[in-house]
């Protein structure tokens, strides 16, 4: 594997004209123009969606030396470079806007932004809020990332969720540090370095295994420190200035060294400078040791080890002269000098890609060697040219990559709710009624209870316990995502949306309880099924009560037809379920058309219900036909579930190996195989006759050998391939429907496309 495919070295004479002191070679991605285009696109998109003026004054990745993305991702091909640079700048913009708010406003915006990515969060998610606009913007770029590399894109989001502690833009108190190591432990999370490397992996299309990470761990330790502390070093003057002028927090390794070693600012900066040089030398020594100990080290690991060093050097070089870190000097109006009492550096080498300024340039006295070197942009006019004519504005106290990852972590941590394992809201206790009943019960003597003729409600603890349990289970949140995505077109007010979510969740969770009982299923989403904890009778009673609650919610809608809509779709749901149970009990395999009709009523009924309720509650007058889309999505969702149950390791973990076979379920792959292979009918009949059908007898799993044989038959007969091709046809039809509706409404819907892409069975 060639190490340097997408980058070129920076000339020594260019490096010497900057205050950069990195000892490592500096390279830049050959496609700096792609990175610049991505930055400008991020600015345009931000301005289009948010209209807050931030894009006009922001200083982000563009500089005369090159784009931050081109230095941070030197070995990333153009298509992926555009994605990661865009995300980096999007994060910087979000962080700037967030930091500019007062604390109360910032916290409100942060909560609402988080609510938009959590399908079961009950905070309002109004379309007009800043968070809602950001959600749509982020959904689009995440969709593009998944389309480029679905597996790596999803891995990146998963790692964000598992390895990143989101920074809430200044919320919380920064601890006092007793050592730089203690500070580093804090900053690894605050900075986002754990999430940055998955971003690099996505960019380089290089998935590191656990064994790979263990092998390169000695190298990554100094690299992590160098990236974080390099940013701290070059941003310290600006952050110090802002802490003096507006009281912003100062979280910086220079400040930590100054405090714990009782040094002056100049002494602390000199100490950090030496620490950075030492870290780079430590990286080189450990790199040589790894190569010596592993002469046959895989080529992809050798490339990774080389690239991370270049990333340190490149971001160091960029930060040494970037307008983001240095332009504040010329925008200051209070006369404060930089913390090191040195004038802003100026770079006199004209850029090949941007117009150079003929304005005045300042000279910098280098504190280390006494030489005078012209370095970085010195006046507002130059900065305007170097940043695509962006005017100066307030900057945050963080790092460009920390800022990028702050947004991405908040997005991916909550976007994961699109995909794997976010938990349902717990059903809310009706505390006032329950407390009243308890006090009423306890306040009576035994004799007065026997003589009392007044009626009162007992406590709801027993009734609610199974409900709380099923609602606590993790969920993919597909239906909640669809409600939010449909609302881009239907524009239902938040009050009605909250009721619709509540009603749909009640029905869905009630159906899960009953399905598990009817299917004799011992597990649900990797946990014991509700009836195995609370018993069949109590579980059924609570599920029935959830239907009562759903009717109560339906009566609260403005549209008087809501209850009728609910009852009609409940009838369809029960009709569909009746045939699913009938086929199983009588061991009669349906035809493919019969099966699809069952799906349209059972699975599609819930999708159709949420759509009809939204249409009934919408305020707009423009008619939007979404009926066909819900039918297609219901079929796609159910058939995909059938397919994955027999093919996916995740389903094995959560439900057991091929649990549909244990249940005796005539799922879509079984139905198709029976329709096309007569001999399979006898085989599957014989298999299913081995399982009990009486609800009291419980389910006895089929022998693993039998299930493996059935799966192998489905595979060799081409049934799985047929199912996958049918799912891809459904995907294409859904995409065509989305295209049609987007044209009719003139409203793009990246959230719905992102949801479909996540569920896709297409190969990457």
Swiss-Prot record:
Binding-site residues, Mg(2+) 2: 95
Keyword terms, alphabetized: Isoprene biosynthesis, Lyase, Magnesium, Metal-binding, Multifunctional enzyme, Repeat, Transferase
Motif window: DDXXD 1: 95-99
Residue sites binding Mg(2+) 3 per the record: 515, 519
Single annotated GO MF: metal ion binding
Annotated residues for binding of Mg(2+) 1: 95
Binding site for Mg(2+) 4: 515, 519
SUPFAM superfamilies: Terpenoid synthases (SSF48576)
Family: In the N-terminal section; belongs to the terpene synthase family.
Protein name: Sesterfisherol synthase
Record gene name: NfSS
């Amino acid at each position: 594997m060639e190490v340097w495919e997408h980058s070129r070295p920076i000339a020594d004479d260019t490096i010497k004209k900057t205050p950069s002191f990195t000892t490592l070679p500096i390279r830049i991605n050959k496609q700096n123009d792609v990175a610049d285009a991505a930055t400008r696109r991020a600015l345009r998109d931000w301005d289009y969606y948010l209209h807050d003026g931030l894009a006009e004054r922001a200083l982000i990745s563009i500089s005369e030396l090159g784009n931050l993305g081109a230095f941070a991702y030197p070995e990333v091909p153009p298509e992926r470079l555009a994605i990661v640079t865009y995300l980096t700048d999007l994060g910087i913009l979000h962080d700037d806007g967030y930091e500019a708010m007062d604390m109360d406003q910032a916290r409100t915006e942060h909560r609402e932004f988080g609510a938009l990515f959590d399908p079961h969060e009950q905070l309002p998610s109004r379309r007009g809020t800043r968070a809602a606009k950001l959600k749509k913007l982020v959904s689009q770029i995440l969709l593009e990332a998944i389309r480029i590399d679905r597996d790596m894109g999803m891995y990146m989001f998963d790692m964000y969720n598992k390895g990143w502690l989101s920074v809430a833009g200044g919320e919380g108190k920064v601890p006092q540090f007793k050592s730089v190591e203690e500070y580093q432990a804090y900053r690894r999370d605050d900075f986002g370095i754990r999430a940055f490397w998955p971003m690099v992996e996505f960019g380089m299309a290089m998935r590191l295994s656990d064994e790979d990470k263990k092998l390169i761990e000695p190298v990554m330790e100094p690299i992590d420190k160098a990236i974080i502390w390099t940013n701290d070093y070059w941003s310290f003057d600006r952050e110090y200035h802002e802490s003096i002028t507006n009281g912003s927090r100062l979280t910086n390794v220079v400040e930590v060294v100054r405090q714990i070693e009782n040094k002056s600012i100049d002494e602390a900066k000199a100490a950090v400078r030496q620490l950075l040089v030492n870290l780079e030398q430590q990286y080189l020594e450990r790199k040589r040791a790894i190569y010596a100990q592993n002469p046959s080290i895989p080529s992809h690991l050798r490339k990774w080890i080389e690239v991370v060093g270049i990333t340190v050097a490149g971001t160091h070089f960029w930060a040494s002269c970037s307008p983001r870190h240095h332009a504040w000097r010329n925008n200051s109006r209070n006369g404060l000098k930089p913390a090191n009492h040195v004038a802003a550096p100026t770079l006199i080498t004209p850029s090949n890609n941007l117009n150079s300024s003929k304005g005045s340039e300042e000279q910098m006295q280098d504190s280390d060697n006494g030489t005078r070197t012209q370095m970085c942009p010195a006046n507002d006019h130059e900065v305007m040219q170097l940043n695509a004519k962006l005017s100066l504005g307030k900057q945050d106290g963080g790092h460009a990559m920390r800022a990028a990852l702050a947004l991405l972590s908040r997005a991916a941590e909550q976007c994961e709710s699109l995909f794997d394992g976010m938990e349902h809201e717990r059903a809310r206790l009706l505390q006032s009624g329950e407390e009243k009943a308890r006090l009423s019960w306890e306040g009576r003597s035994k004799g007065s209870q026997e003589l009392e003729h007044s009626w009162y409600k007992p406590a709801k603890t027993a009734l609610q316990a199974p409900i709380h349990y099923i609602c606590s289970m993790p969920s993919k949140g597909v239906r909640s995502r669809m409600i939010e995505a449909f609302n881009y077109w239907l524009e239902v007010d938040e009050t009605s949306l909250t009721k619709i979510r509540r009603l749909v969740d009640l029905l869905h969770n009630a159906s899960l309880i009953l399905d598990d009982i009817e299917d004799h299923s011992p597990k649900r989403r990797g946990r014991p099924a509700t009836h195995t904890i609370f018993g069949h009778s109590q579980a059924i009673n609570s599920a029935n009560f959830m239907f009562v609650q759903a009717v109560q919610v339906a009566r609260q809608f403005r549209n008087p037809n809501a209850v009728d809509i609910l009852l009609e779709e409940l009838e369809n749901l029960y009709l569909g379920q009746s045939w699913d149970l009938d086929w199983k009990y009588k061991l009669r395999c349906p035809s493919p058309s019969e099966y699809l009709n069952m799906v349209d009523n059972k699975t599609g009924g819930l999708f159709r219900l949420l759509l009809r309720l939204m249409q009934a509650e919408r305020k707009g007058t423009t008619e939007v036909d979404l009926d066909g889309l819900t039918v297609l999505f219901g079929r796609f969702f159910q058939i995909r579930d059938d397919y994955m149950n027999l093919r996916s390791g995740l389903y094995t973990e959560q439900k057991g190996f091929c649990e549909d076979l244990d249940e005796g379920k005539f799922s879509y792959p079984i139905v198709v195989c029976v329709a096309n292979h007569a001999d399979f009918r006898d085989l599957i009949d014989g298999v299913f006759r081995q399982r009990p059908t009486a609800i009291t007898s419980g389910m006895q799993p089929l022998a693993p050998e039998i299930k493996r044989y059935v799966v192998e038959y489905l595979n060799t007969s081409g049934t799985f391939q047929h199912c996958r091709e049918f799912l891809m046809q459904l995907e294409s039809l859904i995409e065509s429907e989305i295209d049609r509706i987007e044209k009719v409404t003139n409203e793009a819907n990246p959230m719905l496309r992102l949801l479909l892409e996540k569920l896709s069975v297409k190969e990457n």
